[in-house]
Design a protein with these regions (language model features):
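Proteins that catalyze or organize thiol-disulfide redox chemistry
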Residues: 1-2, 7, 112, 117-119
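Structural microenvironment flanking redox-active thiols in thiol-disulfide oxidoreductases
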Residues: 26-64, 76-82
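Short active-site neighborhood of thiol/selenol oxidoreductases, capturing the structured segment around
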Residues: 3-26, 32, 44
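Conserved hydrophobic packing residues within short motifs/helices of P-loop NTPase cores
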Residues: 15, 46-48, 71
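N-proximal helix/coil linker or "cap" segments that precede and/or mark the start of modular domains
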Residues: 1, 6-10, 55, 59-62
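Thiol/disulfide oxidoreductase modules built on the thioredoxin-like
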Residues: 66, 73-118
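Solvent-exposed loop/turn segments at secondary-structure junctions
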Residues: 20-22, 51-54, 101
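Signature tryptophan residues that serve as conserved aromatic anchors
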Residues: 18-21, 57, 68
Length: 119
């Protein structure tokens, strides 16, 4: 599925960078998945994997039943979306409300608090 900026221009959205080899980032993905289910569609999500292997990325997405749009082009941190968004580590994230960035690079605990306050 293609995602455009207009898909993220209303309501609350999170863009997150993750990797299969980084436990903290896969844990953050699972938290976002729970928050998305709890929000009943009010939290939009796009994730970007920095895995070199698309298979490793797909294995995590399948294992955790993650179905939102995910980008995994195998280019690690050279990936165009990673560079354009200024994501520099894993986990990393950008929280957007009504088309405006309200937070970035939050820890999982801070991401959780900020999502709950803004839903």
């Amino acid at each position: 599925k293609l995602v455009s900026s207009s898909d993220l221009s209303s309501g609350l959205a999170v863009i997150c960078a993750w990797a299969s080899w980084n436990y903290e980032s896969t844990d953050q993905l699972r938290y976002i998945q729970r928050a998305q289910k709890k929000s009943q569609g009010r939290l939009k999500t796009v994730s970007i994997s920095v895995d070199a292997s698309r298979r490793d990325c797909k294995n995590v997405l399948d294992r955790d039943s993650i179905s939102w749009p995910n980008i995994c082009d195998g280019k690690i941190f050279e990936s165009k979306p990673i560079q354009l968004l200024g994501l520099t580590s894993v986990p990393d994230n950008i929280l957007i409300k009504n088309g405006k960035i309200i937070a970035r690079s939050l820890s999982t605990a801070d991401l959780q608090d900020t999502i709950e306050k803004n839903l």
